[in-house]
């Protein structure tokens, strides 16, 4: 979910602002639901009335956010599947699934998402009143990755996890490059130390094709030798006043 929001904020104009409005409405609504647990009668009805516009804002911004996520997944999924085949050719095809209580179709519009979301709010209103927090909305949704028809989350080996992370990274770079006409600046933190030689080669090849990348490592030995030879290196040293870049 966090990955989708991060990529969508760079891929779609206005997505980040929509997400910010949604999160604000969610905080306000959850506060009111919690307050309602402490009162009853007229006071509880007053809180329900105060909560109504926040619910409407959640439906509006939430449906726009879900539609944005679905559009992103539709564009990202085939690219991700292709990059995963490059990184892990021995593994079965990778599939991406959007998981939600509302069971959205991959091509649903924002208005269709809003209809489903409004129905979910109606269905969970009583339970929310007992539990004191919002039970539906895109903040509850998730993504599942299937390899060979099975969800890899419960059983993925470290190798499978690394393959998926690299494939996601490469797919994100491809998608953003196609959208904006130029590649993003790549930031990698200690990415090489746990990669096997094959995955290192894939990562080095991708980095070499980018105009600019910033990579951190605890030791130069953790980086691919060919990459170090082409890079401008800086060492961070601990001094009396904290860490600093060595001259």
Task: Provide a role label for each language-model segment.
Residues 1-32:
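Extended, charged alpha-helical "arm/stalk" segments used for dimerization and assembly
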Residues 29, 33, 62-65:
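A structural signal for well-ordered alpha-helices, especially hydrophobic packing surfaces
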Residues 33-40:
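Secondary-structure edge/capping motif, primarily at the C-terminal ends of alpha-helices
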Residues 42-185, 194-198, 202-210, 221-230, ...:
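Conserved NTPase motor "head" modules and their coupling/switch loops across ABC/AAA+ ATPases, GTPases
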Residues 184-187, 215:
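Hydrophobic positions in the central parallel beta-sheet of the AAA+
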Residues 189-191:
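Walker B catalytic acidic pair
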Residues 212-218:
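Structural recognition of the conserved hydrophobic beta-strand(s) that form the central parallel beta-sheet
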Residues 214, 232-234:
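Hydrophobic/aromatic beta-strand patches that form the interior of the parallel beta-sheet core
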């Amino acid at each position: 979910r966090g990955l989708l929001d991060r990529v969508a904020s760079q891929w779609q104009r206005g997505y980040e602002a929509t997400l910010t409005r949604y999160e604000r409405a969610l905080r306000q609504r959850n506060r009111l639901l919690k307050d309602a647990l402490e009162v009853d009668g007229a006071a509880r009805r007053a809180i329900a009335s105060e909560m109504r516009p926040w619910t409407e804002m959640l439906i509006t911004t939430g449906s726009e956010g879900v539609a944005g996520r679905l559009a992103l997944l539709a564009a990202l999924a085939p690219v991700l599947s292709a990059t995963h085949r490059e990184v892990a050719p021995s593994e079965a095809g990778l599939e991406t699934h959007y998981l939600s209580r509302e069971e959205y179709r991959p091509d649903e519009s924002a208005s269709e998402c809003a209809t489903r979301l409004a129905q979910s709010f109606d269905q969970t209103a009583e339970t929310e009143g007992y539990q004191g927090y919002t039970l539906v909305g895109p903040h509850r949704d998730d993504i599942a990755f299937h390899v060979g028809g099975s969800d890899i989350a419960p059983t993925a080996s470290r190798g499978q996890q690394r393959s998926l992370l690299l494939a996601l990274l490469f797919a994100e770079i491809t998608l953003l490059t196609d959208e904006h006409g130029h590649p993003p600046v790549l930031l990698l933190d200690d990415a090489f130390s746990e990669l096997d030689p094959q995955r290192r080669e894939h990562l080095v090849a991708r980095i070499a094709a980018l105009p600019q990348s910033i990579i951190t490592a605890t030791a130069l030995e953790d980086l691919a030798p060919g990459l170090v030879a082409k890079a401008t290196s800086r060492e961070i040293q601990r001094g009396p006043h904290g860490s600093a870049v060595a001259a």
